[in-house]
Structure formats: structure tokens, C-alpha cells
Amino acid sequence: MAVSKLLRRRYIVLVISASALVLAGSASAGEGKIALGAKMYDKWFKVIGVPKPEDTHKSLPSSNSKKKGNATHRCKACHGWDYSGKDGAYATGSYQTGITGVRAFAGANPADVVAILKDATHGFEGAMLAGDMAAIATFVTEGQVDMDKYIDRASKKFTGDAAQGKEYYATICVNCHGADGMLPKDMAPLGEVANKNPWEVLHKVLNGQPGENMSGLRALPAQVAADVGAYAQTLPTE
């Protein structure tokens, strides 16, 4: 099915469900929109249900020869899980691009971010609906977490309370990830992921996993997610 047809179908669904979002209340709808935008920052094409891009994004710097295809169309691919781009975890490694992060847009006008998403560099106009871009803009301007408050950049260790995180994990996470973090089987052990890339884990614990039945903890204090991350780092890595 063509992307345009999928987008039209999604537009109808969004119109029908608009009243439900209003009835949910402005506060919860706001957190929900932020979490939606955060999941789209992660993997927008998975969230909106369109075919994943097959080409390499035209704006990926030629200096990066390690990444290609749909991975290069994800916001996080250049701007990072820590939202700091070249000044954060992506200063080195396979995702190094020299591109700046989005931290400077915290508190900015969402319309400015939408305009950037539509510009020639990003080229997302026509790839997603206006509401989708608005959700990303809401996350970028209103939903970024200062990850340096919860993760020590040098050691990659969460600064949360692992003992408290164990209690949260046992009541929120265990059914899907298992007591030892070894589920689902098609995912690397949670302990391994949490220790290798704590910024990704914090982003997903807060906002959820694109295309999966994983709810984010966005409506709760970010410290709860940091505590969960601290406990996850104690789980087996293999």
C-alpha cells in the first residue's frame, strides 16, 4: 500500500479519536503527546505504520560510512539518545556525525521545530502528518530530560536508587522482561543494554517502545525511571 494511502487512513483515525483525547483531560493528553513524540524521535516510521525508508538519509554526513538505510532516518541517529548530538555520547562511535543535538530547543516554540522538520535538510514534510511533526516538536520543546541528572556520563552508571528500582521493576516491568531481564528473547539482555547505553534505556523507560506494548513512565517523576535503570544495570548481561 502506498505511503500516501496509509497517511490518509491514519488521518481519518486521528479525526475520529480526537474527542477521546479531549475527554482524557489536558494534563494526561499533554504527557501522552510528549511520549508519542518521544517514540517518534526514536523510530517515527514504526510508530505511524508506514514502510521504513530504504535509502540513506540525504543529510547524513559523508564522514559517517558506518550507518545506512532506515537507521539514518531516525531523529536519534544524529541527535542522540541523550539529545546532545556531537556533544554527547555520539561524539565518538558508529553514530558519530558531528551534528548538534536538540538540547538548545528545550523551551523553544514548537512551531520552530516543525519548520525545521519540514526544511530541506530534514525533509519530513509528506513523510508524516502535521500532527506527527507536532508531537515530535512537543517532545523536543517540552519533554526533554536532562540526562546528566540521572546518568553519570563518565561511568555510564545511573545515579538512581537500585533498591527502590527493584520494587518498581517487580511491579511494572517483570511481566514482559522477566525477573532476570532476559525477555523478550529477540532482545539483548536488559542488563547488557542498560550498561552499554543507559541513555537509550532512560528514554524508553520514560516514553515506551515504538510499535510494542510497552508503556512509558512519562507521567511519573523521572527519578522513578532512573531508579528502574539503576536496578536494570544490576541484571545479568548474558
What is the meaning of each model-derived region?
Residues 24-26:
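N-terminal signal peptide c-region/cleavage motif recognized by signal peptidases
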Residues 32-34, 44-49, 68-140, 189-238:
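Extracytoplasmic electron-transfer domains, predominantly the class I c-type cytochrome c fold
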Residues 159-209:
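Conserved small-residue-rich
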Residues 30-81, 157-179:
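Sequence/structural segment immediately N-terminal to covalent heme-attachment motifs in c-type
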Residues 86-91, 148-151, 185:
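Short, solvent-exposed loop/turn and secondary-structure capping segments
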Residues 2-14:
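Bacterial N-terminal signal peptides that target proteins for export
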Residues 13-22:
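Bacterial N-terminal signal peptides
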